[in-house]
């Protein structure tokens, strides 16, 4: 159970990082 929690937290962090990176790329493409 503890392992699952850390896995979910890692997945959420990766999702957040990817969305931020995607947003930066979109901003660069617009400007």
From Swiss-Prot:
This is Uncharacterized protein YOL038C-A.
């Amino acid at each position: 159970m503890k392992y699952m929690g850390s896995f979910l937290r890692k997945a959420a962090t990766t999702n957040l990082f990817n969305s931020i990176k995607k947003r930066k790329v979109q901003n660069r493409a617009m400007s």
